[in-house]
Structures are given as C-alpha cells and as structure tokens.
Amino acid sequence: SPLSQKQGYTHKLIVPHAVRLEAGRAYIEETAERIDRGGEGTLNTEGAIAKYVSTEAGNAAADAAIQALGGYGYTHEYMVEKIKRDVRITTIYEGTSEIMEMTISRDRWQQHLKSSGGYYRDQATELEALDQRLPQVGAGIAALAHRALAELMEVARIGRLTRNQHVLLRLGELVAITECSAALARRAARAADGVLPAKADRRFDPAALAAVSRVNARTTAL
C-alpha cells in the first residue's frame, strides 16, 4: 500500500500540520472579520497570534515535508528545501516568534489580572454552550483547554512566575494555540450551520472541518 495510507506517515508528517494550519487560517479570517466590522481597535494581540501560529505551523509543515520525501526532499530538484527556506523567514521578519510570544503573553496576562481570572473562564463557558448545540465541532474540548489555561495563569500569578521571561514566552505560545482552538471550533460551527462568509475557504466540507477542529482541540488540550 502507498505511504499515504499508512498512519505512521500521515498522522505524523501530514495531519498535525494540516490541522494547525487550518487553525491559523480560522483565526486569521475571524480577526479580519472583526477588523472589518470595526469598533474593537487595532487588535494588535490578535494579529500577533495569527502571525505566530500560522508561521510556526507553516515552518513545521515544510520541515515535515522534507522528512516525508526522504533524501529527495533535501535536493534542489524537488523544491521542498526552497519552500522550507522561504517559510522559515516568516518566523523572523515583521517580528520574530519570540517577540510575538512576548506581545501575546503580556496582553493576555493583563486581561487575566483585570478580570480576576475570568477572561478565559468566560470564553470556556461560551464554548461549552456551543458544544451543547453542536458537539461534533470540538468546542467542549476547546473549553477544557481554556479552563486549563485560566488555572495555569492563576498558578503563575500566585507564584509570581511571570517574573521569569521563559514563563512569559511559554504562556504566549499556550495562549496562541488555545485561542486558535476556539476560532476553529467557531468556524466549524458556522460551516455546520451553513453561514460561512462568502469569501471563506471551503477546502473542507462541514463534517471534515468538524473533524479537523476536534483533532486540533484535543492536541491543544494536551
């Protein structure tokens, strides 16, 4: 049987990257819609999350593509090595991934403090309501990730752990993937309801997009 039918190949080198890229796409499109509607400011943190998740996912996907092709992936003829170089720079220009992590964590840390820990708990409650209506889109698992993030931030507050820069960077990463899990669940719900925007990407049908969202939510919650 071809490699494309072997889980050791697809589930390591293809599926995780396709899923994370779709999460980034969902967050980008959701943020773009919010900007178009106006009234929420520049959404700088959301922009940082969109760039961070999408560029890191693209870089990981390109690296996996080289691995998937074996020796051929490393040669000029197959162009994959060029794709890797091209996508690698996206994690550097217009703000490195580390700057994005710091930008994200600082803003969301302030939101956590201002809301007395309610910022992500409130979002989790909304996702749980969505899960009651459309359990297939993975919103319940995304809600679990949001509650876990809220608890983690509270532990960091009590222990004053954010005095350590490494902790802030790690929080930025966790915030980004957690918020993207919610965006993808909402996108899958809109697809199931048949109300995606006219210009939205439709490479996945509603059932497939729901499956993608569930996989992403479970990976995030872990």
Regions found by a protein language model. Give the residues of each.
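Alpha-helical interface subdomain recognition
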Residues: S1-L222
